[in-house]
Curated annotation (Swiss-Prot):
SUPFAM superfamilies xref list: Zn-dependent exopeptidases
Protein name: Succinylglutamate desuccinylase
Catalytic residue list: 224
Catalytic activity: N-succinyl-L-glutamate + H2O = L-glutamate + succinate
Amino acid sequence: MLQALLDSKDFLALTLAHPEQFDGEFSFSLGDHTQVEVWDTGVIVFEPAQNEGKDVVLSCGVHGNETAPIELCNGLIKQLLQQKIIAKQRTLFLIGNPLAINNGTRIIDENMNRLFSGEHSNPPGLVNPERVRAKKLEAYIDRFYTAVADGRQRIHYDLHTAMRASKHEKFAIYPYRPGRAFSGEQIMFLAASGVDTVLFHHEPTTTFSYFSSERYGADAFTIELGKVYPMGQNDMTRFIATHEMFMRLITAKPLELDAFDADKVNLYQVCRVINKHFDDFEFTFATDVENFRSFPKGFVLAREGGQEIKVEHEFESVVFPNAKVPIGNRTVICLIPAVNADVR
């Protein structure tokens, strides 16, 4: 495996050739500047001999059909392995769900991004590949962040693409973080990366980014980089700014960020999440409605169990509507413009 990676510099290809696990860990050096450690399939760490004090996690492929972030991360890994760029920050890349990537599907058995913060081991337990992998990914995050002294900035960008078109092509979800202000610097980093829209979540979740934020105090985000396309069919010119800023972050080049300015970004607050309680749940709007479509107060969004679910605020925008989820799961997130958010 070591020789295959050294020859090809293609970590994604090696991962997909061995989607369940590698036969043990291995490591090697890039010149005298970087130690590379491969912990598992889809798990690779770049340890600079001299680092600048940030611990960066870039994860992708938690959903197997969300290919643009996978190609983006593999491109960065390849540049690092080819020594075209040199890491100056500790960096962990995670390719989340290799089995689903090979399958060309979002999931194998279950939505992995609902299985973190220990949810993987709640009943029925570790009964499918996503649950097993989520537990391992948590362990790799823990190993990475706790291998060095506290006090360093921890960052985790969990990269996705959405199943539908969007009024805002690229957007990020800022996990709930009670008692901690939102980072204006991080929001402006996202804006410089082409991600000009941020949703402030209002409650704990079992997503990957919330896990890193809550457990390790990381500046963590779920980042949606556009729409789902098959592997190899993404227009990677749409990610030039994202690639550039991630490269600057990893190599510790000046980020040259603007000061936080709420007028330069679109900020939303999650006002509620609507979960499914009955099999007859259905939305009243078209199935192909775009993310961030806005509806006025009193509009009937959905019906289930003989009840109507209506817009409660003057206007609410919807993201991720999906009526076909299992009972108990989220069908949609409702948003209002963020006012008085504690951004510093």
